[in-house]
């Protein structure tokens, strides 16, 4: 369902200062398909063999998978952890973990990180890969990184030269074309009590991937999201629609809301619709973005057990989600850091994103407050939809370290998993259609 991208994509301007960059040289781009994969990942494994070479990803479903099913069995269900990290040994591994992960291990003795063998399962359609190779020498970032030009559907900058280009890779990465899922969002308070924040139905579309041979135009919608809330009772009947264009400078993102009590659809600021997941880069124009580099990290990966969990309540344990459901692996990530510009205001002074080299998904992020203290931390849970050649990052969650609370959003397992569907009609993507779907 790639929920991170859907809710995340309420993105405003990407006014990223000096991060704009020209295309890479043909000599550099020649590494794609040789030492690099076509999306820019290192094909080789790492020095000690804990990260294997890339061999094309996971394209064969387990024998227990039923063709056409939206619940995907875990292909690694029989594996055992190679390593368990907790507060007692966290200092040995802290350089390979996000700041949030380290803080949780130090704060809660019961918290643990179960590290399993690494599997580079990401697989994309060949046409998307071919487009990504072409983009390396053709795509351009404009307006200080705020917009892009001459991009075919795929990774726009497989060899990124800046923080802005890396973030565009994250935004425009392949996540399927049309997705329909039912989901829950849960809050867990400081006392460890879980409560249902919202239940809903999500339709997500990435229209730029409907025609893989057509370059983006400035006004082309690259992402659109339609949410209808079914619970709890106080939220039932509400709906939200978001649309984001390829050039947010000329065509800013738009959002609409339907409230059943008012019985009308109104346009709202897309900035007003924010969710605390790793992809939420609300007010990106307020930050200077830097591509820090690439790093080997222990991150949530191949989390089929969590993504397709049948009972959400088994996840929502006090202080942190149940470690029994979280699979961690060592992978290489791009580290991208955003620092608040002088004179700008935001609750986050600094943000640090960890982007998977094989998919460009944001696997995690750390957020810091105005005093420079770690404030919140977010995680997305990756699994490869092996029957569809789609890398997915569902669900996602955020820890509020200042309050000792957390939220997990996009829990789809209890509602049948992730469905890749035919597109909705054009008439269903207009604001006027929201009133009909939102009335109780």
Task: Name the predicted role of every residue range.
Residues 108-109, 290, 386-389, 399-401, ...:
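Short, intrinsically disordered/low-complexity patches at protein termini
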Residues 181-231, 278-353, 363:
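Extended beta-strand-rich segments in extracellular/periplasmic secretory proteins, especially
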Residues 23-24, 29-57, 98, 226-286, ...:
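Gly/Pro-enriched, hydrophobic low-complexity segments
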Residues 26-252:
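Solvent-exposed N-terminal domain segments of exported/luminal and surface proteins
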Residues 1-8:
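Bacterial N-terminal signal peptides that target proteins for export
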Residues 9-14:
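Hydrophobic helical h-region of N-terminal Sec-dependent signal peptides
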Residues 416-440:
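Long, C-terminal catalytic modules of enzymes
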Residues 17-20:
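N-terminal signal peptide c-region/cleavage motif recognized by signal peptidases
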